[in-house]
Curated annotation (Swiss-Prot):
The lineage of its organism: Eukaryota, Viridiplantae, Streptophyta, Embryophyta, Tracheophyta. The keyword Calcium does not apply. [4Fe-4S] cluster binds at residues 43-44, 108, 139. It comes from Arabidopsis thaliana. The gene is ndhK. It is a peripheral membrane protein. PROSITE patterns: COMPLEX1_20K. Its cofactor is [4Fe-4S] cluster. Keywords: 4Fe-4S, Chloroplast, Iron, Iron-sulfur, Membrane, Metal-binding, NAD, NADP, Plastid, Plastoquinone, Quinone, Thylakoid, Translocase, Transport. GO terms for biological process: photosynthesis, light reaction. This is NAD(P)H-quinone oxidoreductase subunit K, chloroplastic. Its main location: plastid. It is found in: Plastid, Chloroplast thylakoid membrane. Binds 1 [4Fe-4S] cluster. The keyword tRNA-binding does not apply. It catalyses: a plastoquinone + NADH + (n+1) H(+)(in) = a plastoquinol + NAD(+) + n H(+)(out); a plastoquinone + NADPH + (n+1) H(+)(in) = a plastoquinol + NADP(+) + n H(+)(out).
Amino acid sequence: MNSIKFPILDRTTKNSVISTTLNDLSNWSRLSSLWPLLYGTSCCFIEFASLIGSRFDFDRYGLVPRSSPRQADLILTAGTVTMKMAPSLVRLYEQMPEPKYVIAMGACTITGGMFSTDSYSTVRGVDKLIPVDVYLPGCPPKPEAVIDAITKLRKKIAREIYKDRIRPQQGNRCFTTNHKFFVVRSPHIGNYDQELLYPPSSTSEISTETFFKYKSPVSSHELVN
C-alpha cells in the first residue's frame, strides 16, 4: 500500500503568498456573513419557514437571522406595507449599522400588489420609504428565488467600494404621495332626517275608528280609501 506523500514547499514559493486589497477583504467578509432582519407583514413571509428548514438550508450562505436591527446588515421585507407600518419600517432601517442592504420580496412589497388599487392606506412600493438593492417579484416567490436573490446580492457586495456604500443616502429617499383627505360632516351627530320620521302633509291620515273596525287583515289601499 502506497503512502500519501505531501510535497515539501519551499519558503520562497510564490504560490504561498496571497495578495489582496483591504476593500476586497472587507467585501468577502461581509458577503460571507450576512445577518438578515426578517420583516414580514403578510403571506410571503411564510416562505422563510422553508428556507430555514433542512431542504434549502440558507445557513450555508452565512445567514443568521437576527431579531434586533442593530445586529443586522440585511433586511428582507415581505408583505403589504401600510401607512401605519411605514414609520416603524423606516425606523428599523435607520437603526441598522452601515453598510446595510434591502431585499424587497413579493409583489405587495414592490408595488403594493392587489391592495394598491382602491386602498387609501397602502404604500405603493417599499422603495418609496427605503432604498432597495434587490427586487424579488412573485406572489409568493419560491424559496429557490429567494436564494437566487441572496446570490445576486452577494455578487453586488463583492463588486462595490466600501466608501461609496457608507455615503449618506438621505438624498436618494423618496416618500409616497400624500393622500388628500376631505373633511365631511359626520352622519352620526344626532340630527336625524325629519322626512323619515314625519310623513309629508299630502299623506292622508287614518282615523282610529277606521283602523279598528276591520277584524281581518286588509290591504293598505282599503285603509286609505
